[in-house]
């Protein structure tokens, strides 16, 4: 259970990285520099800071691809978990549960599984108290 929670936290972190706003490209920075005809030292420092963001864009590309792979695997795992939970919880056949899960969106599946494990974790904590 602990590993599942840690894995979900990592997936959420990668989601934040992958969906963050893309950095400006070096070409766009050159256009800004030409348009503004930099006179102030502050503007030069600002543009230098933005030029460093291109490295972040490359890193985001790597993490974006990694995130897509992790997200795809996580979606498949969550789909299987949702079917198992429905079969166990509602006492229906696997085919019926699969049909219900197929009708749900990916977001609904994630929420369903997380809600189930959240309740389960809360019950375990309350039993220990």
Swiss-Prot record:
Pfam families: Latarcin
Chain positions listed as propeptide in the UniProt record: 21-60
Transmembrane helix as UniProt keyword: no
Keyword Signal: yes
GO molecular function, one term: toxin activity
Compartment list: Secreted
GO cellular component: extracellular region
Listed GO biological process terms: defense response to bacterium; killing of cells of another organism
Keywords: Antibiotic, Antimicrobial, Cytolysis, Hemolysis, Secreted, Signal, Toxin
Expression sites (tissue/organ): Expressed by the venom gland.
Signal peptide start and end residues: 1-20
Similarity comment: family membership: Belongs to the cationic peptide 06 (cytoinsectotoxin) family.
Function summary: Insecticidal, cytolytic and antimicrobial peptide. Forms voltage-dependent, ion-permeable channels in membranes. At high concentration causes cell membrane lysis.
Protein name in the entry: M-zodatoxin-Lt8k
Species assigned in the record: Lachesana tarabaevi (Spider)
């Amino acid at each position: 259970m602990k590993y599942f929670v840690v894995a979900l936290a990592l997936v959420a972190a990668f989601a934040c990285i992958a969906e963050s706003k893309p950095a400006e490209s070096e070409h766009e920075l050159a256009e800004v520099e030409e348009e503004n005809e930099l006179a102030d030292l502050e503007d030069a420092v600002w543009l230098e800071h933005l030029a460093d963001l291109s490295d972040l864009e490359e890193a985001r590309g790597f993490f974006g691809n990694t995130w897509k792979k992790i997200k795809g695997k996580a979606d498949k795992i969550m789909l299987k978990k949702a079917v198992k939970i429905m079969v166990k919880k509602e006492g229906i056949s696997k085919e019926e549960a699969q049909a219900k899960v197929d009708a749900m969106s990916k977001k609904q599946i994630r929420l369903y599984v997380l809600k189930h494990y959240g309740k389960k974790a809360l019950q375990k904590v309350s039993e220990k108290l």
